[in-house]
Regions:
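Solvent-exposed beta-hairpin/edge-strand motifs
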Residues: 180-192, 291-307
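Hydrophobic residues embedded in beta-strands of well-ordered beta-sheets
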Residues: 160-161, 271-275, 309
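Accessory, solvent-exposed terminal regions and/or long lumenal/extracellular loops of proteins
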Residues: 211-303, 315-385
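Solvent-exposed, conformationally flexible loop/turn segments
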Residues: 199-200, 208, 305-316
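Catalytic-domain carbohydrate-binding cleft regions of carbohydrate-active enzymes
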Residues: 1-210, 353, 372, 381-385
Length: 385
């Protein structure tokens, strides 16, 4: 509950203690499109607590799509701060917008609060190790040109990679795009478990409900299972576990010498989870529980008590991502002729392999072709695709 200062930027040196912000932003898509780059590169001079006026500060125009996309980016920013001028028509409260936009805004604000265990741990790493929460990709891939070209893409802590949507929804397909560079390895869509092989750039598409957030293979993300408006430590922690590499994550709670560290070690080869607690356990809720969510698998969550222990994952059955279902949803919401939708879906769903699928989608117009290609790419296991 330490105090914080929000300050204007006063040149190098002024960044060491306060929260900064990117100035009085104009309410436009162009202004939003600059913010992810501005936020991630602030880390280059150690300005790790960098913020922006979510939704834009002044002027501009009323645009619910813009307001929602800015808020989604704000949830995956160092500081989540809605703000505007005193113009009564420029309010940023969720209930100022339509019921559906309001619902999505509230959903994302709750997501932000559920991320507090992860965010707090990452900010401890900033304080003690100088590691920013938001990092440009070239911090990890300094010798790859693609890392410098992906200006609006960044790492959000040690486990997640984010590529905010900064353009309006397409009126035909009701989704918006962003070009994403996937580094080597496997990446999973955090919300849907779609699998992306890291081998280059791909245009990805998301409806208003989603922002592109990707978990690296083996990612471990601790979250509050029952987020409230207070600052009490969670009664139950959700550990989101993504398959792949054997890795560990150390969750930090409390501060200074008066803190608890919970180390979670996941061994996918042996199907084991190791939970180790050190520090002043009296800081934690008396009935603390841990719930393990094994992404991409058809298995019930594993729930255990708050003591050091080893947990067996048991038999794991992969949860298939049905590309036909995704294609159907894509076509269902598109403003295209019914007969064309029906013919295209029939052809795609009866294709024998990805090569046949590519023959079907290659002649299509760009917007439709790219959307279908993403579905195929993130649903198939074929390394030749």
């Amino acid at each position: 509950q330490a105090g914080l200062i929000l300050s204007r930027y006063g040149g190098p040196g002024s960044h060491r203690y306060p929260i900064g912000f990117s100035g009085d932003t104009i309410v436009t898509w162009e202004s939003l499109a600059f913010q992810p780059y501005f936020t991630s590169t602030a880390s280059n001079i150690g300005y790790t607590w960098w913020s922006h006026d979510i939704g834009g500060h002044m002027r501009g125009y009323y645009d619910e799509d813009l307001a929602l996309r800015w808020l989604q980016f704000g949830v995956f920013s160092p500081i989540n701060r809605l703000h505007s001028s005193c113009n009564a028509f420029n309010s940023k409260e969720p209930w100022f917008y339509s019921p559906e936009t309001c619902r999505l805004m509230k959903q994302y604000l709750r997501l932000r609060h559920s991320l507090l265990p992860y965010l707090y741990t990452m900010n401890v790493a900033t304080h003690e190790e100088g590691l920013p929460l938001v990092q440009p990709l070239y911090y990890h891939y300094p010798n790859q040109e693609d890392a410098y070209e992906a200006k609006n893409q960044y790492f959000f802590g040690s486990e997640l990679m984010v590529a905010p949507i900064t353009e309006a929804l397409d009126p035909v397909f009701h989704s918006a795009s962003v070009s994403v560079w996937f580094p080597d390895g496997v990446w999973y869509d955090f919300f849907h478990d779609w699998k992306y092989e890291g081998r280059g750039k791909l245009t990805v598409f998301r409806t208003s409900q989603d922002i592109p957030v990707f978990a690296r293979a083996g990612a471990i993300i601790p979250m509050d299972a029952q987020p409230q408006t207070g600052v009490d430590l969670p009664e139950m922690l959700d550990w989101h576990l993504f398959p792949g590499d054997n890795r560990s994550f150390v969750l930090v709670e409390g501060e200074g010498d008066n803190r608890v560290e919970t180390r979670l070690t996941v061994n996918w080869d042996e199907r084991k989870i190791r939970l180790d607690l050190t520090g002043d356990l009296a800081l934690l809720p008396e009935k603390r529980q841990h719930r393990f969510l094994l992404h991409t698998f058809e298995t019930d969550p594993i729930i255990v008590g708050n003591q050091s222990q080893e947990i067996a994952m048991g038999e794991l059955q992969s949860h298939p991502i049905a590309k036909e279902d995704r294609m159907f949803e894509l076509l269902k919401s598109a403003n295209l002729a019914y007969d064309r939708k029906n013919e295209l879906f029939a052809a795609c769903s009866t294709a024998k392999d990805w090569k046949q699928l590519m023959k079907i989608i290659t002649p299509l117009e760009e917007g439709l072709r790219q959307r279908l290609f993403e579905v195929i790419y993130s649903s198939e296991e074929n390394e030749d695709l």
